[in-house]
């Protein structure tokens, strides 16, 4: 995937691999593609209509996380990144790529990454890179979702934090049955 990097991969229930990537000199939202053959060939490259690639209004993307939840027969994915409109252009044109990076947020997809109808703010202060992991079945972490992110109260680079939550928290009262029904 020329021009992309710092990607996240998720295997879907049908065996396809979903690719979700930052674009270093971005023209917009997150870059996506899929592979039907285990990653040898990537097909259907497009920009997500829903997922930002870092702070909007800049030309530089940001590392984000993506993970598939281990729920049999369903392709529920989570994505993490910044959800901010406060961007400035890079220093070469008088701005800063990090000065207004904020609002670490998680989005949820119920259709294998085609749409992302749910989002939930995790950290409303300065933030930057993030990644996601899920707990394993049969362990104390079962059902938990972990978000590791850069961010603190004053600056994106003053701390690395871990937020732990579950899918119910992400949904914030929305009915999962309704969301799964819309996905099919």
Regions found by a protein language model. Name each.
Residues 1-184:
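Asp-box/BNR beta-propeller blade signature and adjacent active/binding-site loops
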């Amino acid at each position: 995937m020329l021009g992309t990097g710092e990607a996240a991969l998720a295997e879907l229930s049908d065996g396809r691999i979903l690719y979700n990537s930052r674009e270093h000199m971005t023209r917009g939202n997150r870059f996506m593609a899929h592979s039907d053959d285990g990653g040898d060939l990537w097909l259907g490259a497009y920009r997500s209509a829903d997922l930002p690639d870092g702070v909007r209004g800049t030309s530089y993307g940001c590392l984000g996380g993506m993970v598939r939840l281990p729920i049999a027969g369903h392709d529920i994915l989570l994505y993490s990144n910044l959800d901010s409109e406060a961007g400035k252009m890079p220093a070469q044109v008088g701005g800063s790529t990090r000065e207004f990076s904020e609002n670490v947020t998680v989005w949820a997809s119920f259709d294998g990454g085609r749409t992302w109808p749910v989002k939930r703010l995790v950290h409303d202060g300065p933030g930057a890179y993030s990644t996601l992991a899920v707990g394993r079945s049969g362990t104390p972490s079962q059902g938990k979702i972990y978000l590791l992110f850069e961010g603190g109260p004053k600056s994106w680079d003053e701390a690395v934090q871990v937020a732990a939550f579950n899918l119910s928290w992400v949904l914030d009262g929305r009915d999962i049955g309704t969301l799964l029904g819309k996905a099919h």
